[in-house]
């Protein structure tokens, strides 16, 4: 039969393993989210480097309709829409 100390130690080790697994899963989700943001930022930066202005959604609604050559581009999670003019 296991002593109280041994049972307590075993319980503690199991809790540590579960918490490490949970922390690892959360870390992977955070890294995936960071990667998506980097990819979106890189896409908008590339459009700016091509010599076109990138306008955020709040200005797109009015400017893209009035200016010729303005087209809406990628929807992102943080910023709904960008336009290229």
Curated annotation (Swiss-Prot):
Main localisation: secreted
Tissue: Expressed by the venom duct.
Proregion positions: 22-52
Molecular function GO terms recorded: toxin activity
Keywords: Disulfide bond, Secreted, Signal, Toxin
Keyword Disulfide bond: yes
Record bears the keyword Ribonucleoprotein: no
Post-translational modification: Contains 3 disulfide bonds.
Compartment list: Secreted
GO cellular component: extracellular region
Spans through the membrane: none
Region forming the signal peptide: 1-21
Domain notes: The cysteine framework is IX (C-C-C-C-C-C).
Name of this chain's protein: Teretoxin Tan9.6
Organism: Terebra anilis (Auger snail)
């Amino acid at each position: 039969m296991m002593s109280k100390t041994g049972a307590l130690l075993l319980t503690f080790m199991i809790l540590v393993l579960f918490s490490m697994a949970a922390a690892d899963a959360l870390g992977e989700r955070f890294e995936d989210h960071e990667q998506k943001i980097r990819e979106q930022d890189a896409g908008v930066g590339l459009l700016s480097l091509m010599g076109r202005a990138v306008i955020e959604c709040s200005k797109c609604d009015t400017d893209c309709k009035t200016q010729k050559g303005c087209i809406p581009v990628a929807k992102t999670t943080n910023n709904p829409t960008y336009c290229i003019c």
